[in-house]
Regions:
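Bacterial extracytoplasmic/cell-wall-associated proteins, especially those involved in peptidoglycan
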Residues: 25-154
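Single-pass alpha-helical membrane anchors
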Residues: 2-22
């Protein structure tokens, strides 16, 4: 077989592999980003608290505007989910978390993404912890739920 033919076949196979891998990675990445976010934001809130944060992420994705068009876009948007801020104590925790640590968060993320778990926040796109002063944006939004130590707004 000629070198050119070998390179052409190899390139085609690699291109197909790369396309499939990219598609798989994007699906896996979306759930991983959600799992890491809900772990970082609500791991002390139990399953219901993590589900609520996952619901906020999906509600923002569904809005498909300023927030971003994908889970990854939404959670990595600067200053939206504090666990991704470089100066946040949770940033290193979520980036280093292993599969065992993320197990419950990943299960919740997968179920929220698939629609198996409903939105328990009343369509919330925002939330904040009860331990901090109410952000200014709460004045222009409606409170939809209190779940654990978080207040949710739409």
């Amino acid at each position: 077989m000629s070198t050119i033919k070998t390179l052409a076949i190899s390139g085609a196979v690699y291109g197909v592999y790369r396309g499939v891998k990219k598609a798989l990675d994007s699906t896996v990445d979306q759930a991983d980003y959600m799992a890491r976010t809900i772990y970082g934001e609500a791991r002390g809130e139990g399953a219901r608290g993590m589900q609520a944060v996952a619901n906020v992420i999906m509600n923002r994705v569904k809005k498909n505007g300023w927030y971003g068009a994908s889970i990854k876009d939404v959670v990595l948007k600067p200053w939206q989910f504090s666990c991704w801020n470089d100066n946040d104590k949770n940033s290193s925790i979520i980036k280093q978390a292993n599969a065992a640590q993320l197990k419950q968060a990943r299960e919740i993320a997968d179920k929220v993404i698939s629609g198996e778990l409903p939105d328990i926040t009343g369509g919330a796109t925002h939330y904040y912890a009860s331990s901090i002063k109410a952000p200014v944006w709460t004045k222009t939004m409606n409170k939809t739920a209190t779940i654990g130590n978080h207040y949710f707004y739409a």
